[in-house]
Swiss-Prot record:
<dbReference type="InterPro" id="IPR004639">
    <property type="entry name" value="4pyrrol_synth_GluAld_NH2Trfase"/>
</dbReference>
<dbReference type="GO" id="GO:0006782">
    <property type="term" value="P:protoporphyrinogen IX biosynthetic process"/>
</dbReference>
<keyword id="KW-0627">Porphyrin biosynthesis</keyword>
<dbReference type="InterPro" id="IPR005814">
    <property type="entry name" value="Aminotrans_3"/>
</dbReference>
<keyword id="KW-0663">Pyridoxal phosphate</keyword>
<dbReference type="GO" id="GO:0030170">
    <property type="term" value="F:pyridoxal phosphate binding"/>
</dbReference>
<dbReference type="GO" id="GO:0005737">
    <property type="term" value="C:cytoplasm"/>
</dbReference>
<dbReference type="Pfam" id="PF00202">
    <property type="entry name" value="Aminotran_3"/>
</dbReference>
<feature type="modified residue" description="N6-(pyridoxal phosphate)lysine">
    <location>
        <position position="265"/>
    </location>
</feature>
<comment type="subunit">
    <text>Homodimer.</text>
</comment>
<protein>
    <recommendedName>
        <fullName>Glutamate-1-semialdehyde 2,1-aminomutase</fullName>
        <ecNumber>5.4.3.8</ecNumber>
    </recommendedName>
</protein>
<dbReference type="GO" id="GO:0008483">
    <property type="term" value="F:transaminase activity"/>
</dbReference>
<dbReference type="InterPro" id="IPR015421">
    <property type="entry name" value="PyrdxlP-dep_Trfase_major"/>
</dbReference>
<dbReference type="InterPro" id="IPR015422">
    <property type="entry name" value="PyrdxlP-dep_Trfase_small"/>
</dbReference>
<comment type="pathway">
    <text>Porphyrin-containing compound metabolism; protoporphyrin-IX biosynthesis; 5-aminolevulinate from L-glutamyl-tRNA(Glu): step 2/2.</text>
</comment>
<dbReference type="InterPro" id="IPR049704">
    <property type="entry name" value="Aminotrans_3_PPA_site"/>
</dbReference>
<keyword id="KW-0413">Isomerase</keyword>
Length: 430
């Protein structure tokens, strides 16, 4: 028994399922999860001391790589002054100014402590601002675990094989409408059915919780136009894509302007941080300037703000996103080339620092229903083969992969050589 396996057995005695977030349990791929002891650059190290090239990156935040010296130094300096004050700090102001300078649609921003808090608060604000109850989301998209959002959710809930989570009253769920991602007709149909009841659309601009599905041309702008036509707000959930797809997020990359944006992951530099922001007239509707209540004991935590600011400043380096995109393209297209070489059907998607691969004969994956038709068993075999080779991918066929600036020539070469060996083995066994 490895030390990770022993720790997992120990953890299950005191922690539900042995983990603090379901996807970490490896239910989607089988076997026991790795328990991680440390990380540096492009590598994570398990409890047995084995190194892995990491394509999870703490599920997205580690865009510069693990244990980045500038972020570590910023955190250590901040700790010298105390851990939490429950009062305003200059760091919060600096973070707000940095976010606003990078995302043109955000005129004011409120810090919170998680992506779920950000989306939950943005939806409450949209409902309060429009005085409407219903929201519209998309099948396969994931926006955190708030009750109103776990309706035909993606990510871990998708692995459970349930359209929604138990414990959510029907009275909550009835206010959440679910459309088909990349299908404007399904959105318009719902708006025509409820023309004055929908407060907002919330969307992952690149769906990262049914693997990685970019928007088809015109889709995001089409949503913007429908919101304008029916008086609803458009919320772009950039918890995953914010500052990962481009310096101004997916909204900047695709040229669409939302009313509200939710952020997380990258803005925390690895610390627990979320944020929501947007039009000033909408944001002024939040307490204390407006009637919509929202609060948080640790919101704007100085340690988290220090880590986030250090990362955000580093992301302003010229040419960084072009380099990151090139790395991502190389890995995604390298996987596809290896699969083609060995006669194993595979489709790929990638944008910015995100990528996805699908074991399928479908030439292109753009919708949730296509994702559910992919070969999950082949993914599991590939996953464990890569893990044995020292490459750590997301332990679910429904999660995106992430590159970092720390992934260099050596790491990419080793990864693609490993993929070639694993795919060759899969073909030989078929």
């Amino acid at each position: 028994m490895t030390r990770s396996e022993a720790l997992f057995e120990q953890a299950k005695k005191t922690i539900p399922g042995g983990v603090n977030s379901p996807v970490r349990a490896f239910n989607g791929v089988g076997g026991s999860p790795l328990f991680i002891e440390k990380a540096n650059g492009a590598y994570i190290y398990d409890a047995d001391g084995k190194a892995y090239i990491d394509y999870v990156g703490s599920w997205g935040p580690m865009i510069l790589g693990h244990n980045h010296p500038k972020i570590r130094a910023a955190v250590l300096a901040a700790v010298e002054n105390g851990l939490s004050f429950g009062a305003p700090t200059e760091l919060e102001v600096q973070m707000a100014e940095k976010v606003i300078s990078m995302v043109p649609s955000i005129e004011q921003v409120r810090m919170v402590s998680s992506g779920t808090e950000a989306t939950m608060s943005a939806i409450r604000l949209a409902r309060g601002f429009t005085n409407r109850d219903k929201i519209l989301k998309f099948e396969g998209c994931y926006h955190g675990h708030a009750d109103c959002l776990l309706v035909k959710a993606g990510s871990g809930a998708l692995t459970l094989g349930q359209p929604s989570s138990p414990g959510i009253p029907e009275d909550f769920a009835k206010h959440t409408l679910t459309a088909v991602y990349n299908d404007l007709d399904s959105v318009r149909t719902l708006f025509e059915q409820y023309p004055t009841e929908i407060s907002c659309i919330i969307i992952e601009p690149v769906a990262g919780n049914m693997n990685c599905i970019p928007p088809i041309p015109g889709f995001l702008q089409g949503l913007r136009d429908i919101c304008d036509e029916f008086g609803a707000l458009m919320i772009i959930d950039e918890v995953m894509t914010g500052f990962r797809v481009s310096q101004s997020g997916a909204q900047g990359y695709y040229g669409v302007t939302p009313d509200l944006t939710t952020l997380g992951k990258v803005i925390g530099g690895g610390m627990p941080v979320g944020a929501f922001g947007g039009r000033k007239d909408v944001m002024q509707f939040i307490a204390p300037t407006g009637p919509v209540y929202q609060a948080g004991t640790l919101s704007g935590n100085p340690i988290a703000m220090s880590a986030g600011l250090a990362q955000m400043e580093a992301l302003c380096e010229e040419g960084l996103y072009e380099e990151l995109s090139a790395k991502t393209k190389r890995i995604a297209e390298g996987f596809k080339a290896a699969a083609d070489k060995h006669g194993i059907p595979m489709a790929i998607n990638y944008v910015g620092g995100m990528f996805g691969f699908f074991f399928t004969e479908q030439p292109e994956i753009t919708r949730f229903d296509q994702v559910t038709q992919c070969n999950i068993e082949q993914f599991r075999i590939f996953y464990h083969g890569m893990l044995d080779e020292g490459v750590y991918l997301a332990p679910s066929a429904y999660e995106a992969g992430f590159l970092s600036m720390a992934h260099g020539e050596e790491e990419m070469r080793l990864t693609l050589e490993a993929a070639d060996r694993v795919l060759a083995s899969m073909k030989a066994a078929s």
